[in-house]
A protein has these predicted regions:
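Short, conserved loop-to-beta-strand elements that form functional interface hotspots
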Residues: 65-70, 74, 80-110
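Mid-sequence acidic-hydrophobic segments that form the walls
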Residues: 52, 85, 89, 123
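C-terminal edge-of-domain segments
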Residues: 110-125
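RNase III-family endoribonuclease catalytic core
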Residues: 1-79, 90
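Surface-exposed beta-strand edges and their flanking turn/coil or helix-capping segments
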Residues: 1-3, 81-83, 112-114
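Short, intrinsically disordered/low-complexity patches at protein termini
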Residues: 43, 100, 122-123
């Protein structure tokens, strides 16, 4: 249902970065009303977001910790590759990138397989 490739984890990381720097959210920077962002890679958007934040004074991302809440798919086996990809963009050591997965045990929209929630924190300098 997303305008870009709708990678919910990377979108949450982008929003956290922008929020930490007081720069709004991804919808302000990459509006879904602008066709140049239609089907764009979320990795590319993360790169652009990181550049925006660096121009605003971000020195580095010290660590991040995000939880993906969905019934399916089971994601834990994907985490090493996901962490490597995030590290490549943000320059943070893989050891400082923590990803977790949880379910709602069948409850709510996540439990019915209708959507995914991502919560997290990011520490920046």
């Amino acid at each position: 249902l997303g305008h870009s490739d709708a990678d919910v984890l990377l979108h949450a990381i982008m929003d956290a970065l922008l929020g930490a720097m007081g720069l709004g959210d991804i919808g302000m920077h990459f509006p879904d009303t602008d066709n140049q962002y239609k089907d764009i890679s979320s990795v590319e958007l993360l790169k652009r977001t990181f550049e925006i934040c660096k121009k605003a004074g971000l020195k580095n991302v010290i660590n991040l910790d995000f939880t993906i809440i969905c019934q399916k798919p089971k994601l834990i086996g994907c985490f090493p590759e996901m962490k490597k990809n995030i590290s490549a963009v943000l320059g943070s050591p893989v050891e400082r990138i923590n990803l977790k997965a949880s379910t709602t045990e069948g409850l709510g929209f996540e439990g019915r397989g209708e959507g995914i929630t991502v919560n997290g924190v990011i520490l920046v300098e």
